[in-house]
A protein has these predicted regions:
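A structural signal for multi-pass alpha-helical bundles of membrane permease subunits
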Residues: 2-275
Length: 275
């Protein structure tokens, strides 16, 4: 009994340390955004600035075209998320409920794409966007990411957990394939679709490297690029204002994940139920 309690204490201590290490950058970012420049460069590490100042946020909102960059990022993230979610559901439905030649080969080929380093695809995608005339446009950022193999895999695993008699009963009642999908399956997998959509949105919102290659005009930049541009323009000296920009940039994905983490965790748990 004593050994069991000791093991539990060790695990709790380990988890507390892990949580602290993961949350500390966020706490530091928020704390720095509430400091003036003199407080930032103090020798003592003070995570709770006193008195806190919101002047950095006022400066950002008045002198930084934040709404433009938020719209650019939101527009790209919404389109990419909607496309990935729709194609994931439709492809998963085809893989689970249709029998066609080379079905397993196609699915296994899709799984192999997980093992291709993203850096290998950068140059071909860039050349393709160049030939299509999509450089320095939001469409050039969106196009290579409109389909997601991991989303298809997760939706396939979720659909395989739906009882077959339920679907057979719908078919016997005369339901067409699209009716089975939208009237029977979709109500059952809505939490999973919401979960992967949140993950897609957060990933697209935080995307940095690919937009950096595609976008040049300042008016087209996304928030991560705008943050980097701001830091470079200030010579790396206005850290308190930069952290205010970073905090505002981080709020949407943090809030989304906070409200939807239950659905996200359940989706990944369900993906392991059926092999």
């Amino acid at each position: 009994m004593k050994t069991k309690l000791q093991n539990e204490w060790y695990w709790h201590a380990f988890l507390l340390i892990a949580v602290f290490l993961m949350l500390w950058p966020i706490v530091f970012m928020l704390s720095t955004s509430l400091k003036d420049l003199n407080q930032v460069f103090e020798s003592t590490l003070n995570p709770l600035p006193f008195p806190p100042t919101f002047e950095n946020y006022t400066t950002v909102l008045h002198n930084f075209p934040l709404l433009t960059y938020i719209w650019n990022t939101f527009y790209i993230a919404i389109v990419v998320t909607a496309s990935k979610a729709a194609t994931s559901v439709l492809a998963a439905f085809a893989f689970v409920y249709y029998n066609f030649k080379y079905k397993e080969t196609v699915f296994n080929g899709m799984l192999l794409t997980f093992f291709i380093p993203i850096t290998v695809l950068i140059m071909p995608n860039y050349l393709m966007m160049s030939k299509l005339g999509l450089l320095d446009t939001p469409y050039g950022v969106m196009l290579p990411g409109l389909v997601d193999g991991m989303g298809i895999f997760l939706m396939r695993q979720t659909m395989r957990g739906i009882p077959k008699p339920l679907l057979e009963a719908a078919i016997l009642d005369g339901a067409k394939p699209h009716q089975v999908l939208f009237k029977v399956i979709m109500p059952l997998i809505k939490p999973s679709v919401l979960a992967i959509s949140i993950l897609f949105f957060i990933n697209s919102w935080n995307e940095y490297f690919w937009p950096l290659l595609i976008l040049q005009d300042k008016a087209n930049l996304t928030l991560p690029l705008a943050l980097q541009m701001f830091i470079s323009a200030e010579g790396g000296s206005e850290w308190s204002i930069a952290m205010a920009v970073a905090t505002l940039t981080s709020l949407p994905p943090l809030v989304l994940y906070g409200f939807c983490q239950k659905f996200i965790i359940n989706t990944f748990m369900q993906s392991g139920v059926k092999g």
